[in-house]
Regions:
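N-terminal targeting signals for Sec/Tat export/insertion, comprising classic cleavable signal peptides
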Residues: 26-54, 58-61
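Short, low-order "capping/linker" segments at domain edges
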Residues: 97-117
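Conserved short beta-strand edge segments in small beta-sheet-based binding/regulatory domains
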Residues: 84-96
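Short amphipathic alpha-helices in soluble, non-transmembrane regions
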Residues: 39-43, 75-83
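Processing junctions and N-termini across compartments
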Residues: 12, 27-30, 97-98
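Bacterial Sec-dependent N-terminal signal peptides
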Residues: 1-23
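Helix N-cap motif at beta-to-alpha junctions
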Residues: 67-73
Length: 117
């Protein structure tokens, strides 16, 4: 009886760990303000199977939870670059970058300085 209980416990534990499909990662995304935050988070959530996206304005850290069986980090970063924000891996095109609101032009040193005050 003890052996059967042990085998069942082992089986349940194995199945539980096998079902964990969500990856939790943090990446750096460039931006300067709350409008950037909204745009970055929406772009990440629009990526297939992203469950959570929270970007910190001060640290530029984007915390993600996503189903790694259905998408990958590169695809999520591409969605973010498509709306005009750079990541370490994928830089936004000039066209995408220039489409953001003027106060969100994070590559501009004057804009960066304005947001530090």
């Amino acid at each position: 009886m003890k052996k059967i209980a042990f085998v069942l416990l082992l089986l349940v534990t194995t199945i539980t760990f096998a079902q964990n499909k969500n990856a939790k990662v943090s990446i750096e995304v460039d931006g300067v303000c709350l409008m950037c935050k909204e745009r970055i988070e929406k772009a990440a959530i629009r990526a297939k199977r992203v469950k959570s996206a929270i970007w910190n304005v001060e640290t530029h850290e984007l915390k993600l939870i996503y189903d790694e069986r259905k998408t990958n980090l590169k695809a999520i970063q591409q969605c973010i670059a498509d709306v005009g924000h750079d990541t370490k891996e994928i830089k936004a095109t000039d066209e995408a970058y220039n489409s953001v609101h003027p106060c969100c032009l994070y590559r501009d040193k004057d804009v960066q300085k304005d947001h530090k005050n």
